Each structure stands twice: as structure tokens, then as C-alpha cells.
Amino acid sequence: AAADAGTILSYWKLRDTVADGPFWKGTAARVLSFLLRPGYRRAAQARPEFDRAVRSCLEELQALEQEGSPSLDRTADTFARILAAAALPAESSARTRALEQLLYHVGRWIYLVDAWDDLEEDGRTGSYNPIAARFPEQVEANRDYLRTTLLHSLNLARSACALLELGHWQGAVENILYLGLPMVEELVFTGRWKAVKKRNSRRTDE
């Protein structure tokens, strides 16, 4: 089930790149999405509701980006709903709701941290950035506000996790929520994240 969700997300992300990206980047994504299509079709048959949710949310997000939406809440919510939709129905509605909330707030956190990380590049290329659209003249002045809303989402994700029994995954998920994500956020907001990614990429290639 997790593999199906990953395949669906990968396929629609590639299709989104085809729609939004420059010619050569779009061409590469078009080829990759073509190669992924058989696996995507099988995954979509296994998880049709998730497939519909991803397609719908990406279309909604694309529309918000094209209109230059200044609303952080609307754009982050649209992305977060994609991850929330990945939650499989559990044995109780309370567990399903907790899992949806965990994924939703992690998704919201990812979207906003990624937007901050992309500020410089998006400004250089003229690409839409929800933070720049919300604070066109005072991005840096709203750093604390953004970190506060990120902490709010992280705390809600942690609260949802506390309601779940995740078996052997419990420790790993808690480690991500309490250590991994805060560390990434600190690296992003201090401008060190890109250097860390580059260094890790070199190690992977060796």
C-alpha cells in the first residue's frame, strides 16, 4: 500500500513538472512519467481514492500558484491534504483521524520549509513562492512568524503521533518528529541546508 502511494505521488509529480517546467526539464519528466505509467496504473487501481485526491489537490495547487495566491494557509493546506489522503483506513475512526492529522501536519511543515528554502532560487527565476507572495516586501521580517507556524504544525503532528500505536515504527517516527525535522528546519533557516544536501549527494555518488 505504501509503495502504491509512492508510485502515485511520483507519477503526478512528474506530470506536474511537465505542465510547469521549462522545455528540457519537461521533456525529461515526460519520458520518466511514460516509463512509470504501467506501475502508476496498477497503483491507481489499488488506491483509486488516493489517486483522485492527489490529482485534485495538485490541480488546485497549480491554480493557486498560477494566480499568485498570497495565502500561505490555502497553498500549504492543499499540499498537506495530499499526504493526509495517503492514510489507509484503520480499525477505528479515531486511529484513522490521528494518522490523517499526523500526515497532514507533516505535509504542511514540508511545504512551508521547502518554500523558505526555495526563496532565493524562486526570486532569481521568477517562480511562484507562497512566502514571497504573502510577504512581498518583508520576507525576512516574518522569519519568526513562519517558525512559529512551523512549530505549531510540528506539535500537532506530535500530538497525533502520541495517539497512535505504530509498533516497530514508533521509535523511527518519533525520532523524525522530535529530532530530524527540527534539525532540518534549523539548517534551512540558517542557510546551511543546501550545503548539507550537496555534501550528502557527493557521498552517495562515491
Model-based region annotation:
Residues 1-101, 108, 112-149, 155, ...:
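Acidic catalytic motifs of isoprenoid enzymes
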Residues 171-173:
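Membrane-proximal bilayer-interacting regions
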